Amino acid sequence: DCLGFMKPCDINNDKCCSSYVCGRNNHWCKFHL
């Protein structure tokens, strides 16, 4: 299972879905640019 858009995430254990990345500042899954 992966975390969707705007879901809280852990920067050290990024479980965001493939299109997303864990934000370093707010620790939410956001679009990977």
Swiss-Prot record:
A cellular component annotation (GO) from this entry: extracellular region
Task: Decide whether keyword Disulfide bond is in the record.
Answer: yes
Q: InterPro entries, per this entry? A: Huwentoxin-1 (IPR011696)
Q: List the disulfide bonds.
A: 2-17, 9-22, 16-29
The record's keywords, sorted A to Z, are:
Calcium channel impairing toxin, Disulfide bond, Ion channel impairing toxin, Knottin, Neurotoxin, Secreted, Toxin, Voltage-gated calcium channel impairing toxin, Voltage-gated sodium channel impairing toxin
In which compartments does the protein localize? Secreted
Found, by tissue, as follows: Expressed by the venom gland.
Q: Which GO terms describe its molecular function?
A: calcium channel regulator activity; ion channel inhibitor activity; sodium channel regulator activity; toxin activity
Look up the further comments and give them: Negative results: shows no or weak activity on Nav1.4/SCN4A and Nav1.5/SCN5A sodium channels, as well as on Cav3.2/CACNA1H and Cav3.3/CACNA1I calcium channels.
Q: What is known of its domains?
A: The presence of a 'disulfide through disulfide knot' structurally defines this protein as a knottin.
As for family, the record states: Belongs to the neurotoxin 10 (Hwtx-1) family. 59 (Tltx) subfamily.
Q: What is this protein called?
A: Mu/omega-theraphotoxin-Tap2a
UniProt source species: Theraphosa apophysis
Q: What is the lineage of its organism?
A: Eukaryota, Metazoa, Ecdysozoa, Arthropoda, Chelicerata
